[in-house]
Amino acid sequence: GDVYKRQALAWGEGIDQGQRDQVRQLFTDVGEILELAEAKLDAFLALTSSGPAFVALVAEAMADGAVAAGLPRDLALRLSHRTLAGTAELLDRRDLHPAQLKDMVTSPGGTTIAGVRALERIGLRSALIEAVVAAAERSRELD
């Protein structure tokens, strides 16, 4: 299936309500539609079109870490994929802010907070923010 089943629509001048309704119906048949101002489309594309590559890098790095910690590669990849898929499903199904889920699974002095500290130390959050911003800026350049 599709990685992301949402489409963004920006309406140009001269598109009447009837035409908008027809287009909405067409896209609703294949997934959710979001109506955005045209100025926001580059950010939308950066997150939804480039985002899968960023998440794939995270999945690969997590699997590499598990291999370094002793798991066989095939198992590490399978577990990494399932962890990411399960996390995304949980965030979506329970409508959680990512920080809520992080706090739910992080115990004082435990393994998860040790890993979170390591990620904060190396700047993972900043790196991901910069990746999305860079992709949006490049999208604007290509327009």
Segments the model singles out, each with a brief description of its role:
Residues 6-44, 55-94, 138:
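Internal alpha-helical scaffold of NAD(P)-dependent oxidoreductase catalytic cores
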Residues 1-4:
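Short, small-residue-biased leader/transition segments that mark boundaries at the very start
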Residues 81-143:
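NAD(P)-dependent Rossmann-like dehydrogenase/reductase catalytic/cofactor-binding core
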Residues 51:
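Aromatic-residue-lined binding/catalytic grooves and analogous aromatic/hydrophobic interfacial grooves
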